[in-house]
Amino acid sequence: MKVLVTSAWPYVNAVPHLGNLIGSILSADVFARYARLKYGKENVVFVSGSDEHGTPIEIEARKRNIEPKKLTDQAHAYDKKLFIDTWKISFDNYSRTESEVHKEFVRNFLVKLEKYIKVEEDEIPYCEKDKLFLPDRFIKGVCPYCGFEDARGDQCDNCGRLLTPRSLVNAKCALCGNPPVFKVTKHWFFDLSEFGDKIRDWISSSSTMPDNVKSVALSWVKEGLRPRSITRDNMWGIPAPFAGAENKTIYVWFEALLGYLSATVEYFKNLGKEEMWKEFWLYNDTKTYYFIGKDNIPFHAVILPAMLMASNEKYNLPSVIAATEYLLYEGQKFSKSRKIGVWIDEADKLMDVEYWRFILIRLRPEEKDTNFTWREALRIVNTELNDDIGNYANRVLSMVKRYYDGVVPSPKEAIFNDEDKNLITLIKESPKRMGELFELGKIKAGSEEILKLARSGNLYLNNRAPWSLVKTNKEEANNVLYISVNSLRTLAIMLYPIMPTYSSNLYQQLGLSNLESETWDSAGSLKIMPGHKIGEIRSLFKKIEMSPEELMKKLDEIRREVEKERPDLLR
């Protein structure tokens, strides 16, 4: 079994905020770490990269009178360092759309779609003031379906409908606010209409695709798929490979979708195993996981599968598209201009990154929009991490140290009572249930299993009271602490995908080394044997002794300093 894990490619014109992070890259990382324990490191590849082409970058470069690549080089390096060094994202390859491997792959791939490519003249919005053909996203207006006043020329963020610049009411240039004119120009179109039935049959028959993804994809098909332009008139992008399209570039959405393939190709090319990428894209025993935000569902559930089908290469179609709803910030949408939210280069200076990783997974908006509040973030850290998990670990290890000189006692299975057996069953079943939920893209739901086990362990200690049993019934005390110590090993493995450093810390306190050598399937086993010596005990987590108001004030101070350090493009 091979597993390909992907996350939506962040566009380099802004530092990702917490909502961006949980919607794609962090969720993908947590799943990838789980998958490596489940299927073996050699069978899992996790790829993503920087999306850096298109008009927004071209415009910023024009303002600064420099080459676009100079801007994106800085932004790509900044984001990559943030993800890998700060947020501990375990990419196998974090690529970029300026990669030569990517550009070559895209051009070769699109040539293969020739049967489904047609050339048409189209009226494209043009801003006479800015002297620029305007991409769909640089046209703003009123959605004709729901009346949303800030709809874009390609899609309404409010109702999710696909739009065209012509369909917008009171369309305006997003740069200067002037109404655009429409100029006739020739463009190349991918004929999506050829794939409606195939997309419907594929998505309907999937037993692993989440309902929200199925709903959006089937709605698109029902409304009727139409040809989509795959070329643009801007200069900053991959030159179109079609005859007669010498002054055109490939629409960023089409080429960015192919980044999942090119990043895999590039990864194995760098390893000197140039053909191995095919095992992850062309072999039947591969599962492919895409972690995205809900606004990207149509591109991943309709356009990408259609492109893969059209290539006739028998590429694997997505197994699971895990699309989150929106994460709000104190009841509002994240907004860079209004400074509403927290950005990932600020968050790490406010509290430990792995605390943030846990907070965001616990708030992951899997079924509906979720509201981030400082009060809830504090509750998650101080109650769930410290009280439920950390306190349980400390209680167990301290008693082993105190009553058994740090040596795990020998159990007597013949006298296990129902409470003993119930916790053993939970130890065995919790990783299994967590894994099953993860495999469906339900990362937050899977994380619940960690807390269920920790809370059950705490309750078990309270009910069995080993501090009393050591005086009255040593054999039963032995059983309680033997089972409890083993539950901590299970907890450490389950916590690892979310908090790799803290879980390894707990693992080491158990007197074990190299958590990454464990397997997920063994997580539910009682593998810590009698006579095993535990390690040095220390508090696993610390409570945050600040109020929400104090945290927000500190964030403002941090923000002023961080903004000075960002590359030009990201300020």
Curated annotation (Swiss-Prot):
Where does this protein come from, organism-wise? Sulfolobus acidocaldarius (strain ATCC 33909 / DSM 639 / JCM 8929 / NBRC 15157 / NCIMB 11770)
Its recorded name reads Methionine--tRNA ligase
Q: Which gene encodes it?
A: metG
Q: Where does Zn(2+) bind?
A: C143, C146, C156, C159
For this protein, the record's Gene3D superfamilies field holds: HUPs, Isoleucyl-tRNA Synthetase, Domain 1, Methionyl-tRNA synthetase, Zn-domain
* UniProt cofactor note: Binds 1 zinc ion per subunit.
Q: Where in the cell is it found?
A: Cytoplasm
- At which positions is motif 'HIGH' region? 10-20
Q: Please state what class of enzyme this protein is.
A: ligase
So what does this one do?
Is required not only for elongation of protein synthesis but also for the initiation of all mRNA translation through initiator tRNA(fMet) aminoacylation.
Motif annotated as 'KMSKS' region, chain positions: 333-337
GO BP terms in the entry: methionyl-tRNA aminoacylation
Recorded hits in HAMAP family, A to Z, give: Met_tRNA_synth_type1
Asked if the record carries the keyword Aminoacyl-tRNA synthetase, the reply is yes
Please give one Gene Ontology molecular function term for this protein: methionine-tRNA ligase activity
Q: Supply one GO CC term from the record.
A: cytosol
Query: Which UniProt keywords are listed?
Result: Aminoacyl-tRNA synthetase, ATP-binding, Cytoplasm, Ligase, Metal-binding, Nucleotide-binding, Protein biosynthesis, Zinc
